[in-house]
Amino acid sequence: MKNTIHINFAIFLIIANIIYSSASASTDISTVASPLFEGTEGCFLLYDASTNAEIAQFNKAKCATQMAPDSTFKIALSLMAFDAEIIDQKTIFKWDKTPKGMEIWNSNHTPKTWMQFSVVWVSQEITQKIGLNKIKNYLKDFDYGNQDFSGDKERNNGLTEAWLESSLKISPEEQIQFLRKIINHNLPVKNSAIENTIENMYLQDLDNSTKLYGKTGAGFTANRTLQNGWFEGFIISKSGHKYVFVSALTGNLGSNLTSSIKAKKNAITILNTLNL
């Protein structure tokens, strides 16, 4: 209880600094973020979507480091699929009755539940329908990380695993700019592709009724000793002001893949207390 009070008071001080400071420089939220990301190498970024002003940041070095996007790649893939008219909001992805690794994946899915439950087999079905060349073109148009969709060396698995702790890498800073392009409708895709993707990312209202849109991602590194975790997306205030954020981490969190849960929890804690 005392720790919670201390963290909330520290965040209150940071909010006061953000509101009343006449400077436009970003606020370092280390006092708040350090205990939240304890035991991991974490990063948090919050930007004004319109002006590209950095509102708050934690651990700039980590935020500049590329890592596999894991299931956050579904955001980019959703844009591609809707733009190429491979899917629409009424699409049903039919389960083939074979076990898919998680119980929630063993059923038919929609574009919304594909995003909500991070259904890998749906992503793999979509990538194969779009095709490697077209995906590469989209990655270039999106300026998405290192744009490497080759997959693991000598495994020829780019279309099915490039984003899953494999060849495709992107930094939290690069994710921020990608998210800004989405929320500002500044990508060379159909407006409907952007609108449908954003709609399917909606999760909940924050404590102050600000709307939260987001996507998690998680994966074990090659030696399975560390986990990468993501939570990223948009918040839209009651007044309509838009922000983009990324929470990311790398750490030894045991054998259960919980890194994205931690990244999401940390982000929501910070966003709720910032009360934007």
Curated annotation (Swiss-Prot):
Coiled-coil regions listed: none
UniProt activity-regulation remark: Inhibited by penicillin sulfones. Only weakly inhibited by clavulanic acid and sulbactam.
Signal peptide boundaries: 1-25
Binding site for a beta-lactam: S71, K74, S118, T216, A218
Pfam (any one): Transpeptidase
Enzyme Commission number(s): 3.5.2.6
Main localization, broad class: periplasm
Keywords: Antibiotic resistance, Hydrolase, Periplasm, Plasmid, Signal, Transposable element
Gene Ontology BP terms: antibiotic catabolic process; response to antibiotic
Cellular component GO terms, alphabetical: periplasmic space
Compartments in which it is found: Periplasm
Entry-annotated residues carrying N6-carboxylysine: K74
Family: Belongs to the class-D beta-lactamase family.
Subunit field text: Monomer.
Function: Class D beta-lactamase which confers resistance to the beta-lactam antibiotics, including amoxicillin and ticarcillin. Acts via hydrolysis of the beta-lactam ring. Has penicillin- and cephalosporin-hydrolyzing activities.
UniProt name for this protein: Beta-lactamase OXA-1
Species name: Escherichia coli
Lineage: Bacteria, Pseudomonadati, Pseudomonadota, Gammaproteobacteria, Enterobacterales
Gene that produces this protein: OXA-1
